[in-house]
């Protein structure tokens, strides 16, 4: 089984996170940030992984440290669970509509970290959640997984719908990339390593 568990403790947050890439058991997510709980639940469902997260953070300031540190920890768990990346597709992409919004994700589990984030999130807050933290989250995931990640909202009006389309597209693209393909012998790279 491709699994990983990490604990990350700083002066600002305490994160316990585990993933199982080959299980679709019910995910248990409690971050202290309601909107992020919602998005991570969607991500887990659409990536068809089991994701468990327990986080305590300095949310009395804002959610920045909590959101970023969860992204870091998720990225580290993905990197560990994928190990040498033998026989995985490596690449994944998905378009996801959410009512009037359309989100797109393309990713490469290349071992090279990069994020392209192209989304106009016109509403700066959804409840207590600062929408600029969406990019911070994906930056942390991409750099700690060592993936090349492209996210784009092609169009839409409702900020919640735009973000939801991105998280679902990310989940679906990740599922494609991490799927073991029996036609791929070893690592899917001419370099022989990812």
UniProtKB/Swiss-Prot annotation:
SUPFAM superfamilies tied to this protein: Ribosomal protein S5 domain 2-like
Record's keyword annotation contains Zinc-finger: no
EC number from the UniProt entry: 4.2.1.19
Cited CDD domains: IGPD
Matching Pfam families: IGPD
Pathway connected to this protein: Amino-acid biosynthesis; L-histidine biosynthesis; L-histidine from 5-phospho-alpha-D-ribose 1-diphosphate: step 6/9
Record InterPro entries: IGPD_sf (IPR038494), ImidazoleglycerolP_deHydtase (IPR000807), ImidazoleglycerP_deHydtase_CS (IPR020565), Ribosomal_Su5_D2-typ_SF (IPR020568)
Compartment(s) where it occurs, according to its Swiss-Prot or TrEMBL record: Cytoplasm
Location, primary (coarse class): cytoplasm
GO cellular component terms, A-Z: cytoplasm
Known catalytic reactions: D-erythro-1-(imidazol-4-yl)glycerol 3-phosphate = 3-(imidazol-4-yl)-2-oxopropyl phosphate + H2O
GO biological process annotation, one example: L-histidine biosynthetic process
Molecular-function annotations in GO: imidazoleglycerol-phosphate dehydratase activity
Keywords: Amino-acid biosynthesis, Cytoplasm, Histidine biosynthesis, Lyase
Family matches, as HAMAP family: HisB (MF_00076)
Family: Belongs to the imidazoleglycerol-phosphate dehydratase family.
Listed name of the protein: Imidazoleglycerol-phosphate dehydratase
